[in-house]
Regions:
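Short, amphipathic alpha-helical interaction segments positioned at domain boundaries
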Residues: 617-653, 664-667, 671-673, 679
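Short capping segments at the starts of secondary-structure elements
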Residues: 572-581
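Conserved C-terminal portion of the radical SAM core fold
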Residues: 3-6, 326-336, 361-363, 384-390, ...
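Glycine-rich beta-alpha loop elements in corrinoid/cobalamin-binding modules
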Residues: 2, 9-19, 23-47, 93-96, ...
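Radical SAM [4Fe-4S] cluster-binding motif and immediate context
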Residues: 254-420, 432-433
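Short amphipathic alpha-helical interaction segments
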Residues: 591-604
């Protein structure tokens, strides 16, 4: 059996597809004699475009990150709908004010070129006479994958086309199968069990037992063990009727999660133009689901879809998997896809990674209430980049989200990440039902005090996502949902079908007023501009604490705390405290601790930008002095570095990128002086 698995744009060009790596490994385990090839069509697209037109990393990166606007998927809409000028005017009108004209013009050019690329890649896939062609589709891959599946079917009608991935979960998968007849099968849910079962059914569909029947995806094998017995599968019966089997009600146990097989991806990346743009990363998973979401599903989050149940791999097995992949592919940068850190890994997985002796550089998603020593443990294990789900700094808004943290805890994370030298990524989210301008005014007032801490990437209005509580429970505030407007420019489908197919939904704007929103965005923009030039640190010398400040919003530069009460209060403010608890603890050791003095001290420190207050609590914002200048990434300059490999970029195997195209280099500098690209 010949199987081709396809990773279409706009997936990341610095990492292989975890989903396809897992499926390849699983298929080879079940069918050792099968031929399983992965087509890295995202890399092929980069090379194809640089050969046919000017194309830069910034342009690919912009498209890959524009899922919420529909910019990237519209590029493949002409190929999907087989109409060369599909909704060009409508696209310009809907997105023109949001996108700079050069990027808008590039999108129109790519839109015109997309049908040619789709034909080329489909012809190449079909030339290998595959029995099965599988497409993974997550976020902005849908239009490109569907367009290519249509083209593959025209070149090789005998091949069975199969879709899977996050865009196929639940009703989305059934709608995709129902509306696109060139898609023979859709695997909904976790594919490790379902996909091999489908291959078995196809393989037994003809006399010699070697080839699948492919074609229409119809079958009369609807008895026990046939297509009707495969959980979550969408298929067509002998009369052409779409059938959606009930999905599995229990997720796979952690022992069933296999190690991905990435084959020749890293060699292919090195030969691609993308190899001169970004360093590659290994992708792994230690867990699936979300243990916090099992207890308190964050109101806006649609991740995990049908399976929220948290499952994590045995820590030693996970460590062995990471180190095995690192040793095999000779790459130290690792991207962990877990939605949340298994807290047990802090005392199991993390110490074992540290003991490995490798200078690993891992990216991990964590809950934002981790403390400094826990961050140190992760940092020592090589986890230097975190996505922390900070989302907001107002306790009241965080409570509306059901995040399970406070504003002061989030500020503590920003402060302590600066102390231990961890880089982090977060967005400031707004637009929650029940929030008010007052929830943002106090934060905007205090923003200059935080300019030395990692700023949010942006201030972003939430979109309602399928599977989120906001989607499932209209009583929470979003009671008039409709498919996001940009989908109408991509798919030629009625609203009722889009409502089943898509992941994002439009709603009326809720929450903050326009004037407050303008203030928030100005505060975030000012924070981002100031961050690279601002420092605030403290050094605890035992009997005194010295603070050094370079933030332009404050007039002081050096503060020497020598008063025993002030030293004690500052140390207490390492953790969030209410004024009452501060007074109680300080008074237990210092007779001069009075309510008036504590109040005066907190007011003075807030005026100096030393203390952040929210929700009746306060916390100091000064990281421990630890050579922060050596441990920061200058994100504003990542796209202006020299090419990683100019000779490689110009090699015959990989068409040269235009000499004017800036190419990013990300360098992490550790406290010990080691460096390494993180891509």
């Amino acid at each position: 059996m010949r199987i081709v698995l396809v990773d279409m744009p706009w997936s990341a060009i610095d990492a292989p597809s975890l989903a396809l790596g897992i499926l390849k490994r699983r298929v080879l385990d079940v069918f050792p004699n099968a031929s399983v090839d992965v087509v890295h069509a995202n890399l092929d697209y980069v090379d194809w475009l640089t050969a046919h037109t000017g194309f830069t990393f910034e342009e690919y990166d912009f498209c890959a990150s524009s899922y919420f606007s529909g910019h990237s998927e519209w590029i493949f809409s002409a190929a999907l709908n087989e109409q060369p000028h599909w909704n060009v005017r409508e696209f310009n009108e809907s997105i023109g004010e949001k996108v700079p004209e050069p990027l808008l013009a590039k999108a129109r050019e790519l839109h015109e070129l997309a049908p040619r690329f789709v034909r080329d890649i489909a012809a190449r896939i079909a030339a290998g006479a595959p029995d099965v062609v599988g497409f993974t589709t997550t976020f902005a891959q849908n239009a490109a994958a569907l367009a290519t599946a249509r083209a593959v079917k025209s070149f090789a009608p005998y091949a069975a086309t199969v879709f899977g991935g996050a865009n196929c979960d639940g009703p989305q998968g059934a709608a995709l199968h129902r509306n696109f007849p060139f898609v023979d099968f859709v695997v909904r849910g976790e594919g490790e069990a379902t996909f091999p079962q489908l291959l078995t059914a196809l393989r037994h569909g003809d006399g010699d037992g070697d080839e699948g029947d492919g074609g229409s995806g119809s079958s009369d094998r609807d008895g026990e063990g046939g297509l009707s017995g495969i959980s979550g599968l969408c298929w067509r019966d002998s009369g052409g009727r779409c059938v959606a089997n009930p999905m599995e009600d229990k997720p796979l146990p952690p022992g069933a999660l296999v190690t991905p097989e990435y084959g020749d991806y890293f060699d292919r990346h090195a030969r691609s133009t993308a190899g001169s743009w970004v360093e590659p990363r290994i992708v792994v998973e230690g867990s699936r689901g979300c243990w916090w979401g099992e207890k308190h599903h964050c109101a806006f989050c649609g991740l995990n879809g049908s399976f929220m149940e948290f499952r994590s791999k045995n820590p030693q097995r996970f460590v062995d998997e990471i180190l095995g992949l690192v040793e095999r592919y000779r790459i130290l940068d690792v991207w962990v896809t877990d939605n949340i850190l298994d807290m047990a890994y802090l005392t199991s997985m993390a110490p074992r990674l540290q003991e490995s002796g490798y200078d690993l550089r891992l990216c991990y998603e964590i809950k934002s209430n981790l403390r400094r020593e826990q961050l140190r443990t992760l940092s020592a294990a090589g986890i230097g980049y975190i996505q922390a789900g900070v989302e907001n700094l107002s306790s009241r808004v965080l409570q509306l989200m059901d995040k399970g943290v406070t504003g002061c805890q989030n500020v503590r994370l920003l402060r302590d990440a600066e102390t231990v030298g961890m880089n982090l990524n977060w967005n400031y989210l707004y637009g929650f039902p029940g929030e008010s301008d007052e929830d943002y005014d106090a934060i905007c007032d205090q923003a200059p005090a935080l300019h030395h801490l990692t700023p949010p990437f942006n201030a972003t209005r939430i979109k309602v996502e399928r599977f989120s509580p906001y989607f499932d429970q209209p009583e929470l505030g979003f009671d008039e949902l409709r498919p996001a407007a940009h989908y109408r420019h991509i798919y030629d489908l009625p609203e009722s079908e889009l409502a089943e197919l898509v992941y994002l939904f439009d709603s009326r704007d809720l929450g903050v007023s326009p004037s407050c929103l303008d203030r928030l965005k100005r505060a975030v923009s000012g924070w981002k501009d100031a961050y690279l030039h601002c420092r605030l640190t403290h050094c605890d010398l035992g009997d005194r604490i010295v603070l050094v400040d370079t933030r332009p919003g404050f007039v002081w530069r050096l503060l020497d705390l020598t008063d025993p009460l002030e030293v004690a209060v500052f140390r207490l403010l390492d953790m969030p405290h209410s004024p009452a608890s501060l007074l109680r603890k300080a008074a237990a050791r210092h007779e001069d601790a009075t309510e008036e003095r504590i109040t005066e001290l907190l007011d003075r420190w807030r005026h100096m930008g030393i203390v952040f207050t929210d929700g009746g609590q306060c916390i100091h914002v000064a990281p421990v002095a630890a050579n922060q200048d050596l441990m920061r990434l200058d994100g504003s300059r990542l796209h202006s570095a020299e090419p990683l490999a100019p000779a490689l970029a110009a090699s015959p195997a990989a068409p040269a990128a235009p000499t004017s195209a800036p190419t990013p280099v990300t360098v992490t500098v550790t406290a010990t002086g080691g460096t390494g690209g993180t891509g």
